[in-house]
């Protein structure tokens, strides 16, 4: 089953706490262009559905960033969970090598 997630580029200077209040989860994409990383935001409801269907470091996810015209295969590298609330706090994606 192929999972597809659409993200947005995180606005410059935006505060993570404000993003979470607005219903977004901060995220990063690593390895898409060498050592460069991109700060992203993902809708919190999309993240909840993703975490029910995907396993960390095992499930391949199609990530789409329309603002950058980038689409590629990634894996869910890390999920940080809020210790008191038990909700996703931050997620990291790792681009897989094109093969």
Curated annotation (Swiss-Prot):
<comment type="subunit">
    <text>Part of the 50S ribosomal subunit; part of the 5S rRNA/L5/L18/L25 subcomplex. Contacts the 5S rRNA. Binds to the 5S rRNA independently of L5 and L18.</text>
</comment>
<dbReference type="Pfam" id="PF01386">
    <property type="entry name" value="Ribosomal_L25p"/>
</dbReference>
<keyword id="KW-0699">rRNA-binding</keyword>
<keyword id="KW-0689">Ribosomal protein</keyword>
<dbReference type="GO" id="GO:0003735">
    <property type="term" value="F:structural constituent of ribosome"/>
</dbReference>
<keyword id="KW-0687">Ribonucleoprotein</keyword>
<comment type="similarity">
    <text>Belongs to the bacterial ribosomal protein bL25 family.</text>
</comment>
<dbReference type="GO" id="GO:1990904">
    <property type="term" value="C:ribonucleoprotein complex"/>
</dbReference>
<dbReference type="InterPro" id="IPR011035">
    <property type="entry name" value="Ribosomal_bL25/Gln-tRNA_synth"/>
</dbReference>
<comment type="function">
    <text>This is one of the proteins that binds to the 5S RNA in the ribosome where it forms part of the central protuberance.</text>
</comment>
<dbReference type="InterPro" id="IPR020055">
    <property type="entry name" value="Ribosomal_bL25_short"/>
</dbReference>
<dbReference type="InterPro" id="IPR020056">
    <property type="entry name" value="Rbsml_bL25/Gln-tRNA_synth_N"/>
</dbReference>
<dbReference type="GO" id="GO:0005840">
    <property type="term" value="C:ribosome"/>
</dbReference>
<protein>
    <recommendedName>
        <fullName>Large ribosomal subunit protein bL25</fullName>
    </recommendedName>
</protein>
<dbReference type="InterPro" id="IPR029751">
    <property type="entry name" value="Ribosomal_L25_dom"/>
</dbReference>
<dbReference type="GO" id="GO:0006412">
    <property type="term" value="P:translation"/>
</dbReference>
<keyword id="KW-0694">RNA-binding</keyword>
<dbReference type="GO" id="GO:0008097">
    <property type="term" value="F:5S rRNA binding"/>
</dbReference>
